[in-house]
């Protein structure tokens, strides 16, 4: 036995042959390589029969016993094939621990992030070693270019740092009594916002379980994004019901527009329509609302929500931009997606008239003819600004200016 070098030595003391002892052996042999030898050091002299039987049962080779000073050495060689094809890492300590500020970007889970997730990567992430014969999950989104956005770790940290509470962070009792016409306009706007936020919540939820968690940062970020949208639904619902009003009307054009978003099953196309086109335009709408809301409490609601939405847009821009860089042919696919959506929306004439009127009343301050006319003009200016900013975002992701203009012009009149 002296010539048979062992790779692992397990001290079992006075443990008798039992479930506790065999559990330790089971795990030791599970992670060692084929033909490696494991030494069991025990105070027990007469456990050879049980160890030989266990080794035979598991397909290993019992090599024998050696008398040591006050204890005994038993050696078993692993014969069966490896359960793990690589060793787990050890000795790692991530940055930020010593300052009690570890960030997601500081994790060093692997030498590289592969362009394609390993086929056997189940509900686990980089750095976890998978046992052979584990089930294959068949995640639909398993290429990095399908899901990745370069600033995703930073955006995730930002989302945590900028969390706010829709109950305690809004001075609800400071909302003043408003003219019923103005309050009704605000309630109609809040109704519309809630509808759109439900789409922004449900659409990422469709895709989270399809993303291979090898790219861990993506489902984590999308989960934080969904938490943002849930908070927006809550806060807009509360504002609609905070001041003697309540929810108002949903329009066919709004629901049809959101349905065209919801039914898109390609993640890159969905990210393009939702984050780049929709939420990007939504940010301009929120800037408009923040400017013209008549009270500070409602302004704060809009301002905090807009800050979240800007983070979502940042993810989408970098996600789609990266996907286009990897495959420029995607530009044509995204163009076709935008025009296909327009064809679907052409079945409904115009825009949500209830929303546009409410925006005009809000911006003008009342429904008096001159004020309403002024507000309507401001809404038309908003639409132009939305178009200009959409073009900028489309150029940013890699489209030429002419195509960017064409795609922006066919964007849904529902804004989202």
Annotate each predicted stretch with a short phrase.
Residues 24, 85-220, 241-246, 253, ...:
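Terminal targeting/low-complexity segments that flank the catalytic cores of oxidoreductases
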Residues 205-209, 287-290, 303, 317, ...:
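Amphipathic alpha-helical segments within well-ordered protein domains
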Residues 55, 193-201, 222-240, 272-283, ...:
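Alpha-helical transition-metal enzyme core signature, strongest for iron centers
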Residues 1-119:
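Intrinsic disorder
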Residues 238-313, 340-341:
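Active-site-proximal alpha-helical scaffolds that flank and shape metal-associated catalytic sites
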